Amino acid sequence: MSRRRKAEKREVLPDAKFGDVVLTKFMNCLMYDGKKSVAESIVYGALDRIEAKAKQNALQLFHDALNNVRPYLEVRSRRVGGATYQVPVEVRSERAQALAIRWIISAARGRSEDTMTERLSAELLDAANQRGTAVKKREDTHRMAEANKAFSHYRW
């Protein structure tokens, strides 16, 4: 971490189809080897499948899924006198969004459907309905923070 100055945040342009910045961030996290067109086709294909399957606005369902996976508490390690404590801290909104995106993508990659489009659409539908691996990850994170509430006075 630099001591001189804080690195400025890069501005992410909205995506072409929906004009949504969060969707672009999602595609950027999904992308491998700079192949943005592949990531776009996967995400747009998944949103089309959601629209066909759920008969709802796919973008709204995407944002609902993201909000259902966003954590508001997490644990951070803190060394105090030779012992390491897991201290619960609140999650900043930018980090919460980044974690939600990462968790949804990793949960989708771990699913058993044939194509990534199918996996992603299924995981987004599950997350929007408060189930699935990504939501379980969030619940586990919150449970960890709740279990270590006794160490919250070590917060910095």
From Swiss-Prot:
CDD domains membership: uS7_Bacteria
Lineage top rank: taxon: Bacteria
Keywords linked to the UniProt accession: Ribonucleoprotein, Ribosomal protein, RNA-binding, rRNA-binding, tRNA-binding
PROSITE patterns in UniProt: RIBOSOMAL_S7
GO CC list: small ribosomal subunit
A Gene Ontology biological process term: translation
One term of GO molecular function: rRNA binding
Family: Belongs to the universal ribosomal protein uS7 family.
Subunit structure: Part of the 30S ribosomal subunit. Contacts proteins S9 and S11.
Role this protein plays: One of the primary rRNA binding proteins, it binds directly to 16S rRNA where it nucleates assembly of the head domain of the 30S subunit. Is located at the subunit interface close to the decoding center, probably blocks exit of the E-site tRNA.
Protein's recorded name: Small ribosomal subunit protein uS7
Top-level taxonomy: Bacteria, Pseudomonadati, Pseudomonadota, Alphaproteobacteria, Rhodospirillales
Gene that encodes the chain: rpsG
